[in-house]
Amino acid sequence: VNSFYEVMKNYLKVYGEDEAGLSNLITFLNREGDMRFAQDVCEEWQARVKQSFYKNKVDGMTDEKGKIKWPSVFSLYGTTLLGMLITDSFVFSFQIGDGDISAVTKDAVEPLVEPEKFLGTETHSLSKPDAWRKAVASVRRREMESEEPYMYILSTDGFANSYTSDEEYQKTCKDYL
């Protein structure tokens, strides 16, 4: 999450938070959200993992020449990622791996991104090479006229999987309103 936050904070600095800057950011995220933005998030995550590893070295993570086996180190820190930026004019949703990002109203629970579904426990992870290639993202304009209550929910796949049916999961999401 910190990697997503740090990258998004930098994008907001570059583009600016005024109307023109956010308009340009929407355009960029629509075109590059699941590629360039995803690459930046993965690079930030790897830099943080390396920094943590240098502070807290783990035995067995070097080869016979003493070179660090980064894929093995990354797998120690492997995780999926859900992130969201909410502005007055748009919502940007970003995901690598499993989980759910949805908009919830009293009438519906609508996914904002459609990640690849897996059977069993297999999933995409930041620890895998080229994890950014598996990122999914969406930009949705916000409708400001609606007076109806709504919320966004970001959850691990364990939340949805803990219900006996999708209907039960959706009912619980609506109950949070």
Short names for language-model regions:
Residues 1-177:
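PP2C/PPM-type serine/threonine phosphatase catalytic domain
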